[in-house]
Amino acid sequence: TALTELRCENNQLTSLDVSKNTALTELRCENNQLTSLNVSGAAALTDLICYNNQLTSLDLSTNTLLDHLRGWSNQLTSLDVSNNTALTELFCSVNQLTSLDVSNNTALTELFCSGNQLTSLDVSANTDLTNLHCGSNQLTSLDVSSNTALNYLYCYSNQLTSLDVSSNTNLERLWCYE
């Protein structure tokens, strides 16, 4: 269809299928009760805002143009963004993620993954990161030496024993309390 923008936020939707909406570039479906979201055929999608739902999985493998993903406060147990190389903003806080691979997402400037169950996080390939929120996880180490553009680093409530920010000369805010 010719539909390019769909806003259906703040309802009580439990499922949404936009797989036939090939021209869709923006989907806002936040604040619903979604347990199923099919965006597989929406290859033009650049903005997906689906936070505060009940999603346990999200297949983004065909959404290679995706630039912004805001999917916090769901029940995601895994999130594969390896094909989403255009991502600049990834917000996946307050889910149930135990791992997150952002090595292919070299355009990322903002990564919010707080409130998950991450035991490790490799951001060495994300050299454009300016904003990293990874608090309230189970990280035992965090290497931000490659992230020289970082302005904000929130890594509180983890299990870090050391943190080297000597390369992060642009850092304006650092929260690493327990």
Residues covered by each model-derived region:
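Leucine-rich solenoid repeat scaffolds
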Residues: 162-178
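Conserved hydrophobic beta-strand positions in leucine-rich repeat
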Residues: 6-8, 25-29, 46-50, 67-71, ...
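Short "repeat-start/strand-capping" segments in structured domains, especially the N-termini
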Residues: 2-3, 21-24, 42-45, 63-66, ...
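Intrinsically disordered, low-complexity linker/propeptide segments enriched in Ser/Thr/Gly/Pro
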Residues: 1-8, 17, 38, 101, ...
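Leucine-biased recognition of intrinsically disordered, low-complexity hydrophobic segments
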Residues: 3-6, 13, 34, 55, ...
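Consensus "Asn ladder" position of solenoid repeat domains
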Residues: 11, 32, 53, 71-74, ...
